[in-house]
């Protein structure tokens, strides 16, 4: 699978998967031995089981579905970057997340490495872009 196609599929599945809290749809995008860093300061989530646990924990803390939008991914070689904007709500209140995920894909179009970088602020800031 071409990396641009894989990256576009990744953004589409994350958009709907996050809103539906569909961990399995997102997990299927990752290679069996893929590694995901949700933050550069903690240990990575290893394999599909690690990503699944991370997503289930994250979704369990949401009190309503997250609304997320992703920009068209930027692709070079086997890597891609996808910027996103998400409006979340937790027991502590609403949050806006502005972030970017760096991705590396294998030849099957599955994610072998991903790194999230994000900035979080209290409240909901409307989507500033027309993605």
Residue ranges and their predicted role:
Residues 1-32, 129-131:
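Short, low-complexity N-terminal intrinsically disordered segments enriched in polar/charged residues
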Residues 1-2, 6, 53-131:
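A beta-strand edge to alpha-helix "cap/lid" segment located at domain peripheries
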Residues 14, 26-27, 34, 47, ...:
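Hydrophobic pocket/interface hotspot
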Residues 33-35, 94:
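Short hydrophobic/aromatic segments of transmembrane alpha-helices and their interfaces
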């Amino acid at each position: 699978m071409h990396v641009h196609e894989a990256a576009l599929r990744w953004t589409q599945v994350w958009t709907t998967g996050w809103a539906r809290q569909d961990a399995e749809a997102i997990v299927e995008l990752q290679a069996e031995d893929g590694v995901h860093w949700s933050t550069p300061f903690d240990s990575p989530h290893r394999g599909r089981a690690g990503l699944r646990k991370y997503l289930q924990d994250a979704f369990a803390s949401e009190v309503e579905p997250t609304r997320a939008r992703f920009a068209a991914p930027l692709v070079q070689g086997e890597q891609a970057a996808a910027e996103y904007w998400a409006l979340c709500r937790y027991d502590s209140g609403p949050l806006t997340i502005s972030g970017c995920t760096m991705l590396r894909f294998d030849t099957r179009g599955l994610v072998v490495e991903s790194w999230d970088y994000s900035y979080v602020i209290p409240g909901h800031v409307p989507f500033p872009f027309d993605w």
